[in-house]
């Protein structure tokens, strides 16, 4: 069974849609290298791979982006 990721919840937590995959990828790398999931073991077992674990952690607010000022470069300039 896989974990369902609610993209609307992710967008409420992280305002910039382009930051979601970047943050999830960096967290998944951290989990692969040295990190421990911040989810309960049953959820980790259901999620399976590192990217799903990272997305679920973001959705639940268990990890946050420290420097949101950096994310301003992701916002397109519309004329």
Curated annotation (Swiss-Prot):
Keywords, sorted A to Z: DNA-directed RNA polymerase, Nucleotidyltransferase, Transcription, Transferase
Pfam families, per database record: RNA_pol_Rpb6 (PF01192)
SUPFAM superfamilies attached to this UniProt entry: RPB6/omega subunit-like
Xref: InterPro entries: DNA-dir_RNA_pol_omega, Pol_omega/Rpo6/RPB6, RPB6/omega-like_sf
Record-level GO BP terms: DNA-templated transcription
Reaction catalyzed: RNA(n) + a ribonucleoside 5'-triphosphate = RNA(n+1) + diphosphate
GO annotations of cellular component type: DNA-directed RNA polymerase complex
Name of the top EC class for this enzyme: transferase
EC number(s) reported in the record: 2.7.7.6
An MF annotation (GO) of this entry: DNA-directed RNA polymerase activity
Family: Belongs to the RNA polymerase subunit omega family.
Annotated NCBIfam families: rpoZ (TIGR00690)
Complex formation: The RNAP catalytic core consists of 2 alpha, 1 beta, 1 beta' and 1 omega subunit. When a sigma factor is associated with the core the holoenzyme is formed, which can initiate transcription.
Primary role: Promotes RNA polymerase assembly. Latches the N- and C-terminal regions of the beta' subunit thereby facilitating its interaction with the beta and alpha subunits.
Protein name: DNA-directed RNA polymerase subunit omega
Species annotation: Kosmotoga olearia (strain ATCC BAA-1733 / DSM 21960 / TBF 19.5.1)
């Amino acid at each position: 069974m896989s974990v369902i990721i609610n993209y609307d919840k992710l967008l409420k937590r992280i305002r910039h849609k382009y930051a979601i995959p970047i943050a999830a990828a960096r967290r998944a790398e951290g989990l692969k290298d040295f990190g421990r999931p911040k989810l309960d073991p049953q959820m980790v077992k259901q999620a399976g791979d590192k990217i799903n674990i990272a997305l679920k952690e973001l959705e639940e607010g268990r990890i946050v982006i420290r420097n949101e000022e950096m994310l301003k470069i992701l916002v397109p300039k519309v004329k």
